């Protein structure tokens, strides 16, 4: 059995995965980067250092269960988005490891943006999996964008003009004393509020206005704080 290896070293997770020739995920492991309580993120050199330490741990585990000779190709995220100037040093950890593996195994190396991974992962298990034309919403820690996917290419057609939804949630979460990044803990709190009415409290937030496909979220941030 041959496998495709995927590597991603984004700002807050070190991730590797294997898929078989049918596209089924047969291995998927990740390590969340450590952020001290009260902080709103990591400096790039801190993230890079943690990725460099995490990758050997993940690969040691993977190669205990799979033979390196069965890897047919290596894919890696090398930048945040497919736009000019998009760059983060954190991705260098994954790119460096991917280059070494592909060269050692004499197999192809494919580079993608982190955003490509978000969009394709979301469409993979839907009726859009084989579609060549669709609109995707990308909500992450640093990005809130409306994207048009056409024939393998992404173009931005909308989004936020100021902060992203991820930044808004993380700022609220750290103010509440949660560990950054705060999305998962906030999800759990929101679920508890839905199931236990005594925990919920209504907050009147300003309406979000859209202009030519773009919005601003700073008004919500001001209302919350």
What do the predicted segments below correspond to?
Residues 13, 77-82, 113-119, 143:
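Acidic, glycine-rich active-site loops and adjacent beta-strand->loop/helix elements
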Residues 10-49, 155-156:
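Short glycine-rich, Thr/Ser-proximal phosphate-binding strand/loop in the N-terminal lobe
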Residues 7, 75-76, 109-114:
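General beta-strand structural signal in soluble alpha/beta enzymes
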Residues 2, 9-10, 17, 27-28, ...:
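A short helix-loop
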Residues 31, 50-66:
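Short, well-ordered amphipathic alpha-helical segments that serve as non-catalytic structural scaffolds
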């Amino acid at each position: 059995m041959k496998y495709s290896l995927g590597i991603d070293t984004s700002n807050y997770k070190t991730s590797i995965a294997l898929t078989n020739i049918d596209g089924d995920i047969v291995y998927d492991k990740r390590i969340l980067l450590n952020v001290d309580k009260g902080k709103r993120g990591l400096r790039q050199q801190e993230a890079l250092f943690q990725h460099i330490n995490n990758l050997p741990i993940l690969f040691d585990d993977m190669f205990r269960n799979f033979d390196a000779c069965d890897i047919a190709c290596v894919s890696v995220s090398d930048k945040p988005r497919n736009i000019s100037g998009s760059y983060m040093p954190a991705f260098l950890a994954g790119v460096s490891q991917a280059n070494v593996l592909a060269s050692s195994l004499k197999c192809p190396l494919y580079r993608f943006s982190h955003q490509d991974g978000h969009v394709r992962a979301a469409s993979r298990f839907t009726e859009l999996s084989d579609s060549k034309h669709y609109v995707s919403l990308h909500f992450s820690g640093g990005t809130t964008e409306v994207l048009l996917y056409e024939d393998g290419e992404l173009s931005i057609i909308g989004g936020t003009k100021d902060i992203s939804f991820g930044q808004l949630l993380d700022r609220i979460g750290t103010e509440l004393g949660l560990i950054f990044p705060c999305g998962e803990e906030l999800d759990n709190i929101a679920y508890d509020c839905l199931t236990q009415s005594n925990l919920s409290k209504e907050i009147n937030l300003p309406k979000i206005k859209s202009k030519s496909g773009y919005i601003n979220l700073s008004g919500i941030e001001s209302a919350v704080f």
